[in-house]
Amino acid sequence: MRFRYRKWRRPRRLFRSRRRRGYARRRWRRRAWGRRRRVRRYRRRRGGTKRQYISSIMQWNPQHRHLCYIKGITWLCAARADRMSWPGIKQIAATDSTRYWSTILVGGCGVLTLSMDWFFFENLRWRNRWSHSNVGYDLARYMGTHLYFPPLADIWYIVWTDTEFVDQPKKVMSYTHPWILLMTKKHKVIKPRKWNGKGKKIFLKPPAVFNSAWYTSDKWCGAGLGRIYFSFLNPFKQIMHTNQTEQSFPFAIELGNTDYDKPPNNSYDFKDTNEVKKVWNTAGKKYYYRADWDTGDGNAIMLPNTLSPTTPASWLLLEWDAPYWLWFWGKTYQDFVSSHTPEGNPYYGQIYVKWWPITNPYDQGPHTYPEDKEWCLMMLDPQPNFMTCNSIAAALKIAAFGPCVYAPQDTQTSQIPINIPMYYLSKWQWGGSTQGTSTHIDNPCNPRPKSIQIADPATAPRDVIHPWDVDASGTISTAKLKQLMEGLGYREPKPKPGPPETLIPPGAPTPELDYYSSETESDDFDTGDSEEEEEDHQDPRWVRESLDKLTRRLRGERRQRQQLGKGLLALLKEKK
């Protein structure tokens, strides 16, 4: 049945509608079948389980506290075209005999570890500012750091942060590879301004091991607060790079002994460049490498330790089931040469690897069995006076031609060098049992760049006087006095050689008594004269005189200590 919609409006009703009746009144009456049960107004406990009550965690806080914001700018790296796979930063931890050090290298990847040492080191280089001085505060609490990575003009880069780590930075350089960072959770890709890219913000929470607790500032030194993994990212040329016609490229030559279990046997005269060049140009002698075929299964490296490496003991064997483009990432020439330099051998920089005998650049495989890999010598086109570093150059080329890496020919001259800046804001809180330093007022007639006096966090607790360092009379303890003297550059002299320490014989003068006996006598500081003592020491009058002399002597020693403490405090104020 077909329905039709009305095209005309129904006429309005003219008659008056019926008046609406009112609501019926509700009549209440008592139930006839008994009284209602009393309502339970308390919460019933769940059977079998005890309810968990959430309460606030109370922790101790020092009496005097002050917030401090550390705001600054730094650089992650400064790279050029041929060093995109080299490390771009170097950090050396402080020891008992050396201070902390951090510097920027010419490279395109690296790991930056944030710490209290790094923040203070950056302040010494005029790269950050502290909103409040830490002078007078020996406790510190960390509350996190905000990071900002601005976009570059036309270069991509990738960043990843971590607060829970245990390995050393040199052992985690493989995590800075752009292909690995792309598969890491919570990574940040900073697109260039050419592609309408915007900067990325990251907040580094305090590590879980610290739990927002108070520690002395020297304990924060050397403790890693977070790590920043960074590298440049090439999203457009992942496999084939500029001027490449095939995915593969020659990187090694065939050896005489290709046994899988034995070390390679050098059957070529590498001192003769022309002979090696003939082998290089011979068909079937060059091996080709493809990054997309390298799974890492069965890969191995050998480095010579002696002048004539003919036995297994004369080689250093390294095995790691990782592709070579990841193995050689973050390496420099010194990483291959520094610890393997046979004295007197100009051709020590030889690297032997295991790879499939791929002699055709148009080979399409399959190559899936690691047992088919053979030893080969890494080498590029042989050139005179370049044989020492030829194998190392081949290894660095493999790293530079890896996935998502900027090869030397992928960048233009106008883009080099490339710098990656980083802005940060770190929040701290200083604390202590005594009030910290007051605001310093500079001379307005001789203006200087405004700054806040900052003490080295590693030595700040040493220069702070706590209530427990002073006794009831105001005298500084011996241990604290020694620390204050060390802050002024004083070092305790070495004791003179003498007889072993024994009990002082009766009647022998002590150095302390001799010092005070040389002072002039006064009314309230009497050291006593060498009078003849009475034979009868049981006389009460003699006992009272001896006690009176001893009391005056102790009073004088206390006064000398107080004067010495005031003098040291004055010297500390002048030094600050």
UniProtKB/Swiss-Prot annotation:
Compositionally skewed regions (Acidic residues) per UniProt: 520-537
GO cellular component terms listed in the entry, alphabetical order: T=1 icosahedral viral capsid
Coiled coil: none
Native species: Torque teno canis virus (isolate Cf-TTV10)
Chief localization: virion
The keyword Oxidoreductase is annotated on this UniProt entry: no
Keywords of this entry: Capsid protein, T=1 icosahedral capsid protein, Virion
Pfam families: TT_ORF1
Annotated compartments: Virion
Protein name per the record: Capsid protein
Residue numbers spanned by region Disordered: 489-576
Ranges of compositional bias, category Basic and acidic residues: 538-551
